[in-house]
From Swiss-Prot:
Catalyzes the conversion of L-lactate to pyruvate. Is coupled to the respiratory chain. Keywords: Cell inner membrane, Cell membrane, Flavoprotein, FMN, Membrane, Oxidoreductase. It is an enzyme of class 1 (oxidoreductase). Belongs to the FMN-dependent alpha-hydroxy acid dehydrogenase family. Its cofactor is FMN. Substrate binds at residues 24, 129, 164, 278. The lineage of its organism: Bacteria, Pseudomonadati, Pseudomonadota, Gammaproteobacteria, Enterobacterales. It comes from Shigella boydii serotype 4 (strain Sb227). This is L-lactate dehydrogenase. HAMAP family: L_lact_dehydr (MF_01559). FMN binds at residues 106, 127, 155, 251, 306-330.
Length: 396
């Protein structure tokens, strides 16, 4: 199979993975309206093509939280990576490390912090959920600090799990789920050999270490469902801010006022995100939410964004809309499921090449030159102010 884009990896992953795993990563909440809009809205962002700009010295390098990145991309925290490829978190982290970008380890990873951190040279980021069990949260933070994690990504948009209909149909949940998953596994031999037999233990490594016993998929579903905390407020985050020495990023911001609250709280960064359309269906896509948030807090706090990014052109679009850096989620997971570390490495190379093409043809020699002026129109509606006079002149 020829691989030229993330969409090719998606098609390959669908063939390789048991349906319960493919649809768990591919699906969204309710009717998946927001999931679709994440991709569609971003594709509507039109860029200004510029010519004769001497683009021979183009650079994708940027700096975030005093870390040098080869391009403004990091791998997002994704649960259960180790179920998509053998010791998947380690493989993805190695690919990111080699490319010179951060890898973010999820709270609900298969591989524990202590397995992933020593496998790479660059300090990884660690993602933490708001959970009822504050003892677990403190334990996870202590272990992340001990392992040298540089940045904490604190996910706040899951006070309760979203309603994901695909999971019930695919076997991730619903009646006879365990038996359905077993039957799917044995009929997908590549996955069964790579992960089912040789990817063990299939624990939730960070949780198992705390509970002192093995944990499997049923524990993942049950433990998380019982531990999300709907009572959380900014006040509850203060002890985490005091405990964590490094940069702290609040993930799950869609409203400008929440972004301002994050600045007042003292966060170092925010992630404009709707959890990949997996939480509340019908909310704004990240691409639509981003410009207003950037208007509110740009320059006061680092702005990251995720949800709907599938290629290097999408990265450039998100930066033009106001992001400093983006997080890749599903895109890298498709590649990981298809070809492990090599797949993720190839995807990152593709994204870098696509970014260079987009920047060359828009006349942006550096990441700092990708601005609102790079846009013809934001999301198919109003032109940015910088282009309004030109538009009026052309209308005549």
């Amino acid at each position: 199979m020829i691989i030229s884009a993330a969409s090719d990896y998606r098609a390959a992953a669908q063939r390789i993975l048991p349906p319960f795993l493919f649809h768990y990563m591919d699906g969204g909440a309710y009717s998946e309206y927001t999931l679709r809009r994440n991709v569609e809205d971003l594709s509507e962002v039109a860029l200004r093509q510029r010519i004769l700009k001497n683009m021979s010295d183009l650079s994708l390098e940027t700096t975030l939280f005093n870390e040098k990145l080869s391009m403004p991309v990091a791998l997002a925290p994704v649960g259960l990576c180790g179920m998509y490829a053998r010791r998947g978190e380690v493989q993805a982290a190695k690919a990111a490390d080699t490319h010179g970008i951060p890898f973010t380890l999820s709270t609900v990873s298969v591989c524990p912090i202590e397995e992933v951190a020593p496998a790479i040279k660059r300090p990884m980021w660690f993602q933490l959920y708001v959970l009822r069990d504050r003892g677990f949260m403190r334990n996870a933070l202590e272990r992340a600090k001990a392992a040298g994690c540089s940045t904490l990504v604190f996910t706040v948009d899951m006070p309760t799990p979203g309603a994901r209909y695909r999971d019930a149909h695919s076997g991730m949940s619903g009646p006879n789920a365990a038996m359905r998953r077993y039957l799917q596994a044995v009929t997908h031999p590549q996955w069964a050999w790579d992960v089912g037999l040789n990817g063990r233990p299939h624990d939730l490594g960070n949780i198992s270490a705390y509970l002192g016993k093995p944990t499997g998929l049923e524990d993942y579903i049950g433990w998380l469902g019982n531990n999300f905390d709907p009572s959380i407020s900014w006040k509850d985050l203060e002890w985490i801010r005091d405990f964590w020495d490094g940069p702290m990023v609040i993930k799950g911001i869609l409203d400008p006022e929440d972004a301002r609250d994050a600045v007042r709280f003292g966060a170092d960064g925010i992630v404009v995100s709707n959890h990949g359309g997996r939480q509340l269906d019908g909310v704004l896509s990240s691409a639509r939410a981003l410009p207003a948030i950037a208007d509110a807090v740009k320059g006061d706090i680092a702005i990251l964004a995720d949800s709907g990014i599938r290629n290097g052109l999408d990265v450039v679009r998100m930066i033009a809309l106001g992001a400093d850096t983006v997080l890749l989620g599903r895109a890298f997971l498709y590649a990981l499921a298809t070809a492990g570390q090599a797949g993720v490495a190839n995807l990152l190379n593709l994204i870098e090449k696509e970014m260079k093409v987009a920047m060359t043809l828009t006349g942006a020699k550096s990441i700092s030159e990708i601005t609102q002026d790079s846009l013809v129109q934001g999301l198919g509606k109003e032109l940015p102010a910088a282009l309004a006079p030109m538009a009026k002149g052309n209308a005549a």
